[in-house]
């Protein structure tokens, strides 16, 4: 897909959202079932069943997916798609690219070993390694726009309002 095809594909969608802003609000959903046997949660991904369990650093076997890894994978996927889309739109040729996300966790927090230790990622690093002849000013713009438009990056960075409920079934 080139820049013209991307614009042609997105133009009617953008027009719709401009004329009807409420149409742009969509609720994405994820659902999982708690395993009755092991310490795991089966997540319906739409393509396959992903079973998440404890990370080996918290006593897991390593056979199930780690939710922390899944968060980083979602960031990599979203950032990669956004980067490619923006590169196409601003006509930055990408021969190849690698997107890497790393996050630092102190597992003492989630295990309740140290009440002062944070639960969750203390730091996340996102890196793009791109093979392109584009000049540095275009790469700077590409990075700026990728950060601006990546849904997962912006969600992690800005911490949305979140609510948690529990109900008996």
Where are these regions (language model features)?
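Extended beta-strand/beta-hairpin segments
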Residues: 1-73, 85-169
């Amino acid at each position: 897909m080139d820049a013209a095809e991307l614009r042609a594909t997105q133009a009617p969608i953008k027009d719709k959202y401009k004329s009807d802003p409420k149409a742009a609000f969509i609720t994405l959903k994820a659902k999982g079932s708690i395993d009755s046997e092991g310490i795991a949660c089966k997540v319906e991904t739409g393509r396959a069943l992903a079973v998440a369990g404890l990370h080996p650093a918290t006593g897991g076997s390593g056979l199930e997916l780690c939710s922390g890894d899944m968060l980083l994978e979602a960031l990599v996927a979203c950032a990669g798609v956004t980067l490619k889309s923006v590169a196409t739109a601003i006509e930055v040729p990408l021969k190849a690219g690698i997107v890497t996300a790393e996050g630092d966790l102190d597992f003492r927090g989630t295990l309740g070993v140290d009440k002062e230790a944070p639960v969750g990622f203390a730091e996340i690093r996102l890196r793009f390694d791109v093979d392109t002849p584009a000049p540095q000013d275009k790469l700077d713009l590409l990075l700026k726009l990728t950060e601006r438009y990546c849904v997962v990056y912006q969600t992690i960075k800005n911490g949305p309002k979140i609510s948690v409920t529990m109900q008996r079934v």
